[in-house]
A protein has these predicted regions:
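Flavin-dependent oxidoreductase catalytic cores
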Residues: 2-144
Length: 144
């Protein structure tokens, strides 16, 4: 892949690391695979669920529940990770990055719920000039 992939772009993979059921892919197997990917030039792994079986009863659903797994993969495979799954608050996203559980947070549900989530998060976290997370044509008119 690296032979044809532009060097100026990161090479990332979203990988379902486990189905959290006996007999399915294990996190240890995923870490071994990620190490192989890294040796071939992978820059970042987006840690996700497997969804290879219909039974999701073993999944530990909850706020930011994949972040600890992203942290483990980041540590053991020594590769940057993206953490996602039910990251809803600015504080959750900030903690994941600050505590080095992930290098990037994925915000699908949060962004669907609030397309201006980055601006609201920046304001909540006290970021100066938070309005500039919005497009310039909007930010210009907002008073903070």
């Amino acid at each position: 892949m690296r032979e044809v992939w532009p060097t100026r772009l990161p090479l990332t993979v979203r990988l379902g690391i486990s189905d959290f059921k006996e007999g399915s892919q294990t996190i240890e197997e995923s870490i071994a695979l990620i190490k192989r990917f890294k040796a071939l030039g992978l820059d970042l792994i987006d840690v996700s669920l497997g969804f290879n079986i219909p039974d999701v009863s073993g999944v530990p659903w909850g706020p930011a529940f994949m972040a600890p797994y992203a942290a483990r993969i980041r540590r053991e495979a020594e590769i940057p990770t993206a953490a996602g799954w039910f990251i809803a608050t600015p504080q959750q996203a900030d903690a994941i990055v600050r505590e080095e559980q992930g290098d990037i947070v994925m915000l699908a549900h949060a962004m669907l719920d609030d397309p201006n989530w980055p601006w609201h998060a920046a304001k909540a976290l006290g970021v100066p000039n938070a309005k500039w997370t919005l497009p310039a044509q909007y930010a210009h008119w907002i008073r903070e």
